[in-house]
Amino acid sequence: MAEIVEYIGTGRRKTSVARVRLRPGEGKFIVNGKELKDLKEYLHNDAWVRHALKPAVLTDTLGRFDIFIRVSGGGLSGQAGAIRLGIARALLQFNEDLKPLLKQNGLLTRDARIVERKKYGLKKARRAPQFSKR
């Protein structure tokens, strides 16, 4: 039996985690077990779709792989960022020569910004209750 070639990348953004698998194919998207025509059916927003697919578009590999994505946590914006990092890391497994191009465009950097925790005595993370002088 022929061995299935697969490239795996994990991406995280805010509280979202995406596990991305690329298999040589005709460009299908399978997100959380559902086959979709394109990523817009899942993300619903053109800007998020462009954001998520930037590594594949930049490296001209968009139609060459079937993309299997398991994504959980967070909202759609965070999930788009997680998918983007996952695709970039999987493409790096496919071809190490893409590293300078991906790195130059900031696609291999994990965005470390997460929500700051709420502190006691404050209304939000930094918002203090209104101060009254008298």
From Swiss-Prot:
Identify one Gene Ontology CC term for this UniProt entry: cytosolic small ribosomal subunit
Please report a single Pfam family linked to this protein.
Ribosomal_S9
Q: Name one GO molecular function term.
A: structural constituent of ribosome
Which example biological process does GO assign this protein? translation
State whether keyword S-adenosyl-L-methionine applies. Answer: no
Stored SUPFAM superfamilies:
Ribosomal protein S5 domain 2-like
Establish whether keyword Ribonucleoprotein is in the entry: yes
Keyword terms: Ribonucleoprotein, Ribosomal protein
Q: Which family does it belong to?
A: Belongs to the universal ribosomal protein uS9 family.
Q: What is this protein called?
A: Small ribosomal subunit protein uS9
Question: What's the source species for this entry?
Answer: Kosmotoga olearia (strain ATCC BAA-1733 / DSM 21960 / TBF 19.5.1)
